[in-house]
Amino acid sequence: MTNYPQLNTEINGNEIKLIMHTNKGDMTFKLLPDVAPKTVENFVTHAKNGYYNGVTFHRVINDFMVQGGDPTATGMGGESIYGEPFEDEFSKEAFNIYGALSMANAGPHTNGSQFFIVQMNEVPESMLSQLADGGWPEPIVKAYAETGGTPWLDQKHTVFGQLIEGKDTLEDIANTKVGPQDKPLHDITIDSIEIVE
């Protein structure tokens, strides 16, 4: 039986628990190194080194996603720990369901430091039937139906974690007022990211 680690809130096996402290509150995630080892190593190393401290969520689209991780706050910046953009790590076990922690990119194999958290509350009915027909696993289609998500990003953006606590904070961030280019009018910042060993 295939394991879909995003469908439970326990920290199992190699999974890593982290708390993202923001000026809107905390969000707790579990990271999935078995699914996306290189991506998780990149994120955890950046977090431990304070790379994300003080960095904003520079792009917020309510009922879609909130994006951060760019020290320049332009959407053009950020880099990986590897010194160059690194490859996508797609999996048949991880999907862009509501609360997924996923890598932003500028096309295939262009991962750096930017990430987004999926915040779409409802997947249209017509899309759900397409998922079932398109080979998405039944438990994942069910999760999309019950909690929402962005299935069209599956196999296009690397999913490497899942929100397990702090939905209110995510919704609060998503509901902020934005200006041009979906940039919040008032900075929403990551104060720090704590790895819970």
Curated annotation (Swiss-Prot):
Keywords of the record? Isomerase, Rotamase
Q: Where does the PPIase cyclophilin-type domain start and stop, copy by copy?
A: 14-195
Check the record and name the SUPFAM superfamilies matching this protein.
Cyclophilin-like (SSF50891)
Keyword Isomerase on this protein?
yes
The UniProt entry's GO biological process terms, in alphabetical order, are:
protein folding
One MF term in the entry's GO annotations: peptidyl-prolyl cis-trans isomerase activity
Protein name from the UniProt record: Putative peptidyl-prolyl cis-trans isomerase
Q: Which InterPro entries match?
A: Cyclophilin-like_dom_sf, Cyclophilin-type_PPIase, Cyclophilin-type_PPIase_CS, Cyclophilin-type_PPIase_dom, Cyclophilin_A-like
Stated family = Belongs to the cyclophilin-type PPIase family.
